[in-house]
Regions:
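Membrane-interface loops
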Residues: 50-63, 91-165
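N-terminal transmembrane-helix/juxtamembrane module of multi-pass inner/ER membrane proteins
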Residues: 2-83, 128-131, 140
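Residue-level signal for alpha-helical transmembrane segments in multi-pass membrane proteins
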Residues: 42-45, 85-92, 115
């Protein structure tokens, strides 16, 4: 019997999944999901425990002419839907594509995290006060409480978008 390569199209029946089957060809791609908690812990360490790091400010002249718009929150949130949607779709519908996407994410997000540890960056683009008081500006203010303006280059949003393509 010919051995199948990981790229062979296998449609897993997730109803049959048991932990003892995690190393089988049908379900081994599930282990790639372990990257997300590991990345989350590494990013948390970067964001919360490097409070006194010397950050390199990322800035260009174009930054000075782009006005703040609370409406930008909507495409920002849709980016998460885009990335999670692409991962979910490929996980259930196209396992070889899921494996490729996750390998790309693992390599590039890990490389970005190493860069952040070695060369911390930040942007100083946030307004001191919002021009309007509405639901979107309150949501942006809430996001600012946990989504810092640090570790911005290389951009995980750009990397994630490329992965989802």
């Amino acid at each position: 019997m010919k051995a199948r390569s990981p790229q062979t199209t296998i449609k897993p029946d997730y109803r049959q999944f048991r932990l003892c089957k995690l190393n089988t060809l049908e379900f081994s791609h599930i282990k790639l999901l372990l990257f997300w908690p590991a990345f989350g812990l590494a990013f948390l360490a970067l964001e919360r425990f490097r409070l006194h790091a010397a950050y390199h400010v990322m800035h260009c002249a174009l930054d000075d002419v782009i006005p703040f718009s609370e409406w930008a929150l909507i495409p920002y949130l849709l980016w998460f839907v885009y990335l999670i949607g692409a991962l979910t779709y490929t996980f259930f519908r196209n396992v070889p594509a899921f494996r490729r996407m996750m390998r790309f994410v693992i390599v590039t997000y890990t490389a970005a995290t190493v860069v952040y540890f070695i060369y911390p960056t930040q942007q100083l683009l946030r307004p001191e006060a919002f021009a309007h008081d509405n639901a979107l500006t309150r949501a942006v203010a809430w996001f600012y409480t946990f989504d810092t303006n640090t570790n911005v280059c290389p951009s995980l949003h750009v990397i994630g978008s490329a992965a989802a393509l």
